[in-house]
Amino acid sequence: MKQILRAFLFLLLFTATVNTAIADEKANVTKQGTVRGRIIDATKQTLPGASIYIEKLHTGVTSDVNGFYTFSNLDPGTYTVKVSYVGYSPVELKITIPAGRTLEKDVVLNEGVELQEVVVGGAFQGQRRAINSQKNNMGITNVVSADQVGKFPDSNIGDALKRISGINVQYDQGEARFGQVRGTSADLSSVTINGNRVPSAEGDTRNVQLDLIPADMIQTIEVNKVVTADMDGDAIGGSINLVTKNSPYKRTIAATAGTGYNWVSEKAQLNLGFTYGDRFFNDKLGLIVSASYQNSPSGSYDTEFVWEQDDDGKTYVNDYQIRQYYVTRERQSYSAALDWDINANHKLTFKGIFNNRNDWENRYRTTLKDLDPDGNATVRIQTKAGTPDNRNARLERQRTMDFALGGEHLFGALSMDWHASYAKASEERPNERYIDFQLKKQKFDMDLSDERQPFASPKTGSTMTLNDEFSLKELTEQQEDIKEQDLKFSANFKLPFKNGNKLKFGAKVVRKTKDKEVDFYEYSPLDEDAFMTNSLANTVDQTNKNFMPNNKYQAGIYASKEYTGSLDLNNASLFEKEQVQEELAGNFNARETVTSGYLRFDQKLTKDVELMTGLRI
């Protein structure tokens, strides 16, 4: 509470100082006027990043993500305004600024050059918006629009990000999950939604799973590779800002449907999307709602090897794994945005988004453990599964939500915006089960002629598939619950000067909580012989002729997911239960409050050169 009071006291004192300076500069400042409006095209689509320039004052601004622009602190009179936008014909118009009032002036731009002999059809409005926003941004920024994302079959934001220069991604089952900016670790960059940092449901890092958010729920992706003073100072690599859909200038209805087929799972995929937006009450109230649903059954074949060197410097494979995955990912996402234009000087906004991803995974794994240079190893056969209520699969349910209320206000020359938001991320992994069998002292012939595809062949009497020679290594189940919540309040002020310079200042308070709870249990059957008999009677053969190219590797026989999921582990007459105490050391409850403030000054040195300086504490 003390930090919050200090932040507001700082803002009040600074605002009072600025207002005093304005009053000293001109006694009759109340007679100055403001022009505010929106840049749109002929179809009433907003144009963010448009350049608006007042020739008489040699100063200009750019329209924001919703196409709005504002010139304040203008002497009454007539001005010539030039508006330009890549791909559109420039417009020049005259406006008359009233004394002490705000003039609302929307500007309509038309398509650029028209060819008579050659007709080219296409929709590049979003691409133009992205180019203009990128061109007029003072920082090192990449902007990707919705229609650019729509050109590719990207199901989530992570897959869309990988097409931006300077971004590389980490994959999980063929989908981009974590984004890395300029080669830095994923937890050294920030991911925000509409400027608010997304909480992380990862237990030990700040990584945000980008595949949570469907690509069709985002209007614009902004990648800031340089963090300026008015942005949160918690990113070294850069900041990825996801801008959700804003209320349109006119009624908008859109629906999408798609399907596909995965050859590993041999199942069809489904993608659905819907968007509705309109304005009401003489365009004072804007509304847009969107929904997205994706169901993607998939799978993968995987081989993994760990190489070592012996005392003589000879390389050999120490760990040899063959894996078969079956994964179904279901995404649901809902968003809504409201804006209410109270009058020309005051506006209220609300934005909310909810994302849910259910990830059901079964994994069958064969491991040659502690493989030595002579080919001796222990064979491990493992099945990953879950309980019947979770489709006998490991369920990972991740959710993120962000709800923000904000306002934009104009007090003479001073503009202000504020935001109060609540965000939450969570991950649940109930009843995650592993059943692991082992067979020791097995011998293999190792073919290491191809370093990318080393191959192990069992010698006589050895095996790599589950049979009655194996014994139970371990049977485990774990429950995991991770939650992170953020409460934020921020206020930002901007004061333009007649010479084109701008002063920005503001403060922000963030209250964060994060909790992690993991319970991990090991189970031992009271009658191991009967348990092994039942296990061998409930197996599944994962041998597949298309497992890998040239049929070189095969997965083999495993305990089935149905059998693993049906085990009555809490039955004391069948199993002995023991909690693994070492796993409890990773549990925690954390609380954090961060109070920050900043100053930023944009100075126009020449027509083509600007200097940006800033301080953040």
Regions picked out by a protein language model, each given a short descriptive name:
Residues 57-68:
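Short, acidic Ser/Thr/Gly-rich low-complexity loop/linker segments typical of extracellular
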Residues 190, 220-224, 239-245, 252-311, ...:
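Predominantly transmembrane beta-strands of Gram-negative outer membrane beta-barrel pores used
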Residues 267-367, 398-405, 412:
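Transmembrane beta-barrel wall of Gram-negative outer-membrane proteins
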Residues 72, 197-225:
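Short acidic/polar hinge/loop motifs at secondary-structure boundaries
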Residues 445-474, 528-586:
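Flexible glycine-rich, low-complexity coil/linker segments exposed to the extracellular/periplasmic environment
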Residues 103-107, 157-160, 177-180, 192, ...:
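N-terminal periplasmic accessory domains that precede
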Residues 24-32, 36-45, 50-55, 84-88, ...:
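Short, acidic, small-residue-rich periplasmic hinge/interaction motif at the N-terminus
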Residues 158-197:
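Extracytoplasmic beta-strand/coil segments of soluble accessory domains associated
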